[in-house]
Amino acid sequence: LFIYGVNVKKRILSGIQPSGELHLGNYFGMMSRMIEYQEKNDLFCCIVNLHALTTIDDKSILSKNTVNAAIDFIALGLDPKKTTFWIQGDVPQVCQSTWLFSNITNMGLLDRSTSYKDKIAKGLKPNVGLYSYPILMASDILLYGAHIVPVGKDQKQHIEIARDIAIRFNKIYGETFVLPEPSIEKNNRLVPGIDGNKMSKSYKNTIPIFGSEKIIRKRFMSILTDSADINEPKDIDSPLFKLFSLFLNQSEIDELKDRFLAPGMRYGDVK
């Protein structure tokens, strides 16, 4: 799929799990950036349905989610004429390379995965698929010769693992894979869920993009806040403030901050 050194233009790669309905974390964490990148870059974007197997074991649900994710992504602005867009599981070489990479990856590299430890702490069932998740992600990245992988700060370690695997493979078999670089925007913010943790379907704390008015309203009204009195300053580090800020420009964020710190406002007014 990729021949070392042939590509001149920098290739950007990103993917999204079809774990359920798309939410604000998907859009502000990755999708909005991809829609912007497709205008001037060699963008590769895929629906990573194999990764979703760590949380979904119902074939019909996964199939439905995969199709819906592709439809929703296009509805939000991804243009297949400007982007290489595909379903991860449709390329068997991904699994083949994952097995090859597994045999040159030291256990210690995976043992240090903070993402795995965090997911287990949040209640996800530990299994080999979840543990070896970074190797499958490395296949996604290396197989397509990605130079740049936009990620949040919490995903940077996965790119570092992919680099380590590429370096070891190249050392054993000769120069084959590009060494990918993570791209973390300086203003990139972790999108909080309604409970204050990272918004994730795994944590059941999401706000859907295409949900009904009733569902979206219920989720917003459930956003975690403290018990500050109406005349007390409100917490600008709260998930409510951070979520609201995603929809605002800097001057509007400053105005919202003033409202939070001034007396007379209730959290319910913002919701």
Q: Model-flagged regions — what are they?
A:
Residues 73, 101, 154, 196, ...:
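Divalent metal-coordination and catalytic microenvironments
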Residues 84-87, 150, 228:
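Short catalytic-loop micro-motif centered on adjacent basic/acidic residues
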Residues 26, 157, 163-271:
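Conserved nucleotide- and phosphate/pyrophosphate-binding catalytic cores
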Residues 10-139:
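N-terminal Rossmann-like or analogous alpha/beta NTP/dinucleotide-binding catalytic cores
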Residues 107-111, 143-150, 248-256:
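Short helix-capping/linker segments at secondary-structure and domain boundaries
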Residues 59, 148-152, 176:
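Short, polar/flexible loop-turn hinges at active-site or ligand-entry regions and domain interfaces
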Residues 1-7:
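Short, Lys/Arg-enriched N-terminal segments with co-localized hydrophobic residues
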Residues 118-169:
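Internal, conserved structured core segments that host functional sites
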